Structure formats: C-alpha cells, structure tokens
Amino acid sequence: MKIISEGETKLMVPEESTLSKKDTVFYNPVMETNRDISVSVVQSFLDNFKRDEFLMCDPLGGSGARGIRYANELKFNGELKVSIGDINPSAVKMIKENLKLNELENVEVFHEDANVLLSKNFKIFNVVDLDPFGSPVPYLDSGIRASLTKGGLLCMTATDTAVLCGAYRKTCIRKYNAIPLKGDKELAVRLMIGYAVKMASKYDIGLKPIFSHVTDHYARTFMVTERGAGKADSAIENLGYIRQDSEQKSFKTFEEGYEKGYAGPFYLGEISDKNIVQNSLETAKNRNYSKRAIDILELISKESKIEQVGCFDIHELCSFIKKLVPPVNDIMENLKENGFKVSRVHYNPYGLKTDAELSDLVVLISEYHSKKY
C-alpha cells in the first residue's frame, strides 16, 4: 500500500491495481482529473442547494477515492452525509482505512451490491454517482429511483466509449437501445444521456444535463432530476436522430423513427449549463486542482456558449475537400473576422464548434489556400 494525495484528500491505495486478480481493490490514478471535475461540478450544484441536509451515494466505491473526496472537499453549511458501497470486502476495508486517514465521520460504508444499496434507499439521495467499470446501464434504473428527491442529481460515467462511438453497433443497440454513429465523440455522451432520459421518463421524471464531457476513455454527465410528466415530456422533446450526410459530411437532425442512414436517439439539447461550468471552473482554480481538469473546464466554458451538436473536424473536412490542413488558429481567426462564434472542443484537437455552416467553412478554407499559395 502507499499513501497519495488527490485534491485536498489523502488516499491509501494499492501499489498496483490489477483488475484480473481476484479480490483486488481498484484505484485508477488516471481518473484523478475526472474526480477533480466531479467535485467542482457537485460543489457548483451544492452552492444553490436550499435544504439543511445533503445526502450522497457512491455505490461502486472501489478504494473510496470518489466518495471520500466528496465527503472531505465539498463545502456545505448544512449536514453533508456520504454513503459508499462496494461488493468487495477488501474494498470496504480500504474505504474504512481511508476514512480514518482523513478523520472523516460523515461517511457510512456498506458491504453491498450497488443495485441492492440503491434499491434500499428509494427517493433518499440528493446525489447518486454511478462510476462503474464499463457501462452504467446495469445500475441506471436503481440509480434513477434512488435520486428521485426533489431536484436530485444523477452523475454517470461510461467507459465503454467504443460501444457508444459505434465500433460495436450491435452491442450499442442491445445495451442502449440506440443506433450509434461513428465519428464525433460528443455523440457518445449524447447517446448515453438519451438512454437515461428514456429510462427516467417511465417514472414521470425529466432529466436535465447540467455538465457533460468526453475525456480519455470515458463519457461523463451530470443530470438534475425533475419530477412530473410535463418535465419528462420536455426532456423527451430533446431526443432526436442524426444522419451523417455521405456527400457533405454534415450532421442533420431527424425527429421521427429509424430510417436508413440515421442513428440515435441522441439528446440534442444543451448538455452543459453555462453558469454551472463557469462556477465549476472557478472552484477548480481556487482549490488548485490539476491543470488538466482546469484546461478541460476552460474549453467546455467556451464550448457551452455555442449551440452546435458535435463539432467540425478540420482534418476530416480538409481531407474531404482535398485541401491541406491550415493551422486551426488561423481558421478560428478567419471565422471571427467574418462574424462567427467559434471555439475549440475539449475532446478533439482539430475540432471546432461554431455557428457557421459547413459551406462557410469550406469557403474560408478555400480562400485561405488561394491567399497562401
């Protein structure tokens, strides 16, 4: 074992974490950025929370890193309580050791299956955070029901992004009841949100995303639960279908059914709230969280100001129109000079969000080459 620091928290973790070994406690240091962002986003949500008690659940605890950081780092004037569960007895033991290490008394630990723990706490938690290895689908129904408090928050990670991005089409249809589309990674999180919205609607619950990102090998979203059939209907109205036009390489929305060449349903509404993003960014900066977390939040802050599903990949576009790829910064400047909004995206170094049309980009790139060569 070794002791490390994440954010403002000390953690005892295994020297090596190997999933193939039976009874091994899993800790993933690569996900520190994920946890930095998560604490920042939940803090932003908590800043507007009006009740005296705030109850959270991390039902897939592992080493306890996520739940313990919530318990230790979230600032709240009322009573903050965190429930952490894991089916692995070695994980439960490590979580308890980490509680002692941080001198925390506001955490309850459960040696229990995640679905059992959530089902026992129907409508109890203000926040449920599903962070599994793989797909969140097996835990989603019980996670939704456990977070049905008024204005609850459901956080969800999927590490099966190859499935969500279309590499395994049949698996995606089977697990998410949706047809994936290869290409833009943002569509992975939009497909995941779309599935969650459909799941919640059967309980007359609407889900409203307030923050989403696609980083490394995972997609992640935070959704507020809103009660009532009307709220569920409003959420469903944001579902739609997308077709990647083989001639123009553009995305087009389609609202009715599966037709040849169309994929979905995807959530086509806003997936990150501008105020939540900005407040999360300020929290991450004030607490000196990892530079990478801050960089991602800064990019999402800019992205969230432009209403566009997905992005334009400049490499892909130039390949299609048979032009050399100009410096991305030059294209951005040209767009701004022509009155368009534009931002880089956090998940693709060659991706741009803009209110310009595809035809505008083609013209600007062609003009750039005519002036340069």
UniProtKB/Swiss-Prot annotation:
Binding positions for S-adenosyl-L-methionine per the UniProt entry: R35, R66, D86, D113, A114
SUPFAM superfamilies assigned: S-adenosyl-L-methionine-dependent methyltransferases
GO molecular function: tRNA (guanine(26)-N2)-dimethyltransferase activity; tRNA binding
Enzyme type, top EC level: transferase
UniProt keyword terms in alphabetical order: Methyltransferase, RNA-binding, S-adenosyl-L-methionine, Transferase, tRNA processing, tRNA-binding
Pfam families: TRM (PF02005)
Alphabetized InterPro entries for the sequence: SAM-dependent_MTases_sf, Trm1, TRM1_arc_bac, tRNA_met_Trm1_C
CDD domains linked to this entry: AdoMet_MTases
EC identifiers of the protein: 2.1.1.216
Ranges of residues in domain Trm1 methyltransferase: 2-365
GO BP: tRNA N2-guanine methylation
Catalysed transformations (reactions): guanosine(26) in tRNA + 2 S-adenosyl-L-methionine = N(2)-dimethylguanosine(26) in tRNA + 2 S-adenosyl-L-homocysteine + 2 H(+)
HAMAP family, alphabetized: tRNA_dimethyltr_TRM1
Assigned protein family: Belongs to the class I-like SAM-binding methyltransferase superfamily. Trm1 family.
Role noted for this protein: Dimethylates a single guanine residue at position 26 of a number of tRNAs using S-adenosyl-L-methionine as donor of the methyl groups.
Protein name in UniProt: tRNA (guanine(26)-N(2))-dimethyltransferase
Naturally occurring in which organism (per UniProt): Methanococcus maripaludis (strain C7 / ATCC BAA-1331)
Underlying gene: trm1
